[in-house]
């Protein structure tokens, strides 16, 4: 992928009709990024990165993950405030997932921190499948839910887009779509939990051999971000 630091690349992208980029920023914690070998993402450069996109009329959708070993309970408010302060247009917010076959899964398995072997739950949205290091699974889930609803709250939408001012005619409806979509997501999750109570054995993985994992899923970590945004 061409570097997002290349202004000529961004100029050509905008001229082609590109409206938005997805970039795996992953976290506002440099310690969390360094701990997962993603130190090429520099938190101190996020504002400049956004300004470069916005100068070309391109919005930025960031991938944000919660649940890294260096994340504590402050990470949720820090993320919402930090992304609001720099005018991030949108975010796809998820839970860190240690997919079988990755070093993340092997590490957590060796530390006896995998608590859920039901494959349906490895979706980054509905369940915490391991024990986080600096909070409980319930605290991680609650913080994740809070951060999503806060990021897409009317106050935060106004704050972020007042800074961005990029494609407001489509960026405002896009944010509102996410805001209203959270209600549907919560209903779907509640329905999923009800089904699981009725059919507890469906889809359960009895045991996953961490030394073999699952072929075709050999990433460096459970989730993959963009390379080189300095």
Give the positions of each predicted feature.
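Small-residue-biased low-complexity repeat regions
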Residues: 213-228
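A structural motif corresponding to the C-terminal lobe/cap of the Radical SAM core domain
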Residues: 1-169, 193-209, 230
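Short, amphipathic C-terminal "tail helix"
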Residues: 171-200
């Amino acid at each position: 992928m061409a570097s997002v630091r290349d202004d000529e690349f961004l100029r050509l992208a905008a001229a082609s009709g590109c409206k938005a980029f997805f970039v795996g920023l992953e976290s506002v914690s440099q310690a969390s990024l360094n701990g997962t070998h993603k130190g090429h993402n520099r938190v101190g450069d996020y504002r400049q990165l956004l300004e470069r996109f916005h100068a070309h009329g391109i919005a930025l959708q960031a991938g944000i993950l919660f649940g890294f070993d260096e994340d504590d309970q402050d990470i949720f408010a820090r993320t919402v405030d930090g992304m609001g302060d720099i005018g991030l247009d949108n975010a796809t917010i998820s839970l860190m997932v240690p997919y079988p076959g990755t070093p993340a899964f092997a590490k957590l398995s060796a530390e006896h921190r995998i608590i859920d072997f039901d494959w349906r739950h490895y979706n980054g949205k509905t369940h915490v499948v391991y024990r986080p290091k600096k909070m409980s699974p319930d605290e991680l889930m609650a913080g994740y839910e809070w951060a999503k609803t806060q990021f897409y709250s009317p106050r935060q939408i106004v704050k972020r887009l007042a800074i961005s001012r990029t494609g407001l005619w489509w960026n405002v409806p896009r944010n509102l779509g996410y805001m209203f979509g959270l209600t549907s997501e919560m209903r779907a999750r509640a329905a999923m939990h009800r089904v699981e109570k009725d059919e507890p054995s469906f889809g359960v993985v009895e045991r996953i051999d961490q030394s073999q994992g699952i072929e075709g899923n050999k990433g460096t970590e459970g989730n993959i971000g963009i390379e080189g945004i300095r």
